[in-house]
């Protein structure tokens, strides 16, 4: 495997262990260290490799449709999940919940969630995805590597957070893996198709802000979280994001390669 890929994966897992360990010891800043560890790892590897900001994807390029997908994808998927739950009486909203209250709370949560999304996406889609692409790793394998790394990266934090899930671990683990993999394929494709990291940042921030709002106190009087949770591991969410991932892959790829200015330096690529 390409040395910088190994360096990044080792660094991001190592920093996540440090942050989660601090969190388990009662040091709250450990949660922030964990959340920002993909960005920290990317900076470390970029400095060691002398890469600077090349290949991050800070430009706003590509077709607007990919940006719209990033904006509406998670609100639509969560609406389907919760809506189906309401339809079959597996979800009951709190008595004071309204569309306006959920929207206002989501907007209020958006700014901090954008910061956290930058912390993650500048590592996953801002470094690892384009690094694999520059080294001629096919898209399916690219997103699978990123998705598996993303899943494993969560493990220390999940173990440090006893209330992270109410599902038994044997059931939660495969569902969570499927949910994260579906997201990795979608967000990875937005990165490769637009050559920009921003669609992934937007999608991640919006999805996170809305999800945590919906899971806030009083929003649901009751919910069958196994099937209809708005989180990635909800079964309906897995189905919806899986369908989106399949549809995204059916979009024809452009025949022309990305411009040289968006590719990683030659010394990071296989000759």
Locate each region found by the language model.
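Aromatic-anchored segments of alpha-helical transmembrane domains
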Residues: 13-21, 75-83, 148-157, 205-218
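Membrane-interface helix termini and inter-helical loops of multi-pass transporters
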Residues: 55, 87-97, 159-168, 218-227
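C-terminal membrane module of polytopic membrane proteins
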Residues: 205-271
């Amino acid at each position: 495997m390409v040395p910088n890929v190994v360096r990044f994966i080792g660094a991001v897992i190592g920093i996540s262990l440090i942050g989660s360990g601090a969190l388990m010891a009662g040091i709250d800043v450990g949660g922030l260290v964990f959340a920002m560890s993909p960005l920290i790892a990317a900076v470390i590897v970029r400095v060691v490799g002398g890469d600077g900001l090349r290949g991050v994807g800070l430009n706003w390029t590509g077709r607007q449709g990919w940006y719209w997908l990033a904006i509406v994808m998670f609100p639509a998927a969560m609406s389907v999940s919760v809506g189906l739950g309401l339809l079959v009486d597996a979800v009951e909203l709190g008595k004071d919940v309204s569309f306006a209250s959920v929207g206002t709370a989501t907007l209020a949560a958006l700014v901090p969630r954008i910061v956290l999304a930058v912390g993650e996406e500048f590592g996953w889609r801002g470094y690892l995805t384009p690094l694999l692409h520059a080294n001629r790793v096919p898209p399916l394998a690219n997103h699978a590597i990123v998705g598996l790394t993303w899943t494993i990266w969560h493990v220390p934090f999940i173990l440090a957070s006893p209330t992270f899930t109410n599902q038994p671990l044997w059931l939660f683990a495969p569902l969570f893996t499927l949910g994260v993999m579906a997201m990795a394929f979608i967000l990875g494709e937005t990165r490769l198709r637009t050559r920009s990291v921003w669609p992934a940042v937007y999608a991640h921030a919006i999805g996170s802000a809305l999800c945590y709002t919906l899971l806030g106190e009083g929003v649901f009087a009751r919910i069958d979280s196994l099937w209809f949770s708005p989180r990635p591991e909800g079964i309906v969410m897995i189905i919806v994001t899986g369908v989106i991932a399949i549809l995204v892959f059916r979009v024809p790829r452009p025949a022309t390669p990305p411009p040289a200015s968006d590719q990683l330096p030659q010394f990071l690529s296989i000759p």
